[in-house]
Amino acid sequence: MNIDGKRVLITGGSSGIGLATAHALALRGARLLVTGRRSGLVDAAVDALRATGADVYGVAADVATEDGRAMTMAAATRYLGGLDILMNNAGAVRAGRLEEIQEDEIRTMIEVDLVAPIMLARAALPMLKAEGGGMIVNVSSSIALVALPFYATYAAVKAGLASFGESLRRELNGDGVHVLTVYPSGTDTPMMATNTAGADVGFSLESAAAVAAAILDGIEREAIAVVRGGPDRQAMIDLNRDDPRAVDARFLSIKAAFEQGVRPHKAL
């Protein structure tokens, strides 16, 4: 896909991977609408993007709500006149033992990470189909490929998003709309700020800019998937497929330290 002139909606576009991708797309000539729940962050993101010459608008909206999604889609029509690319990037996470996580926290992850992308894709499809060359980019997680302990709900919703994208891609094959699924590994973003797990338990972080560059490449190639994490992550994915008990044993050996590191992880 040639990105120049494309109209792109990025949810969760005021920070992290979303903002980094907005910068990368702007350099390719895309027109942008970025969303986020916090108006101050959205305004700051828009100012930073416009300072580089980007054609960008922002809207403060909670895509986990019906009203927030309606506001977002109305803004896409008002500011961009339609859509060529929908990037479902907004995310929420709460780590810890399942019985210690509150029901409202579980529901928030389900609503933000799974329900919102499905509903936004549904709402955007008429616009994407009208252009005859649209794309949906769903930001899942490498945890959808190898489910980590103490992330049961987050792993479930991210795996659900990946399966949603796979099914929808096949449904839309031949209809002019492509679906790309992105699987970031650990990324240095505000969402990861409360995760204290380190390299001793296998956590390492790459920059949001590196992930954004990979997403940009995936969009241009109309790739099916972008998987981050390098050879070590791919080896873990392969092992999890071929010998899941070996992965069970590996996590058991670091379970106490792993739990201590990820237990504070919360971004809702």
How would you label these PLM feature ranges?
Residues T181, A197-A235:
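C-terminal helical subdomain
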Residues A121, V157:
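Active-site helix of classical SDR
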Residues S39, A60-M73, E103:
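The beta1-alpha1 cofactor-binding region of Rossmann-like NAD(H)/NADP(H)-dependent oxidoreductases
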Residues R28-A45:
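Conserved glycine-rich Rossmann-like NAD(P)H-binding loop of the short-chain dehydrogenase/reductase
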Residues S14-G16, R38:
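Conserved glycine-rich cofactor-binding loop
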Residues S141:
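Residue(s) in the substrate-gating loop at a strand-loop-helix junction
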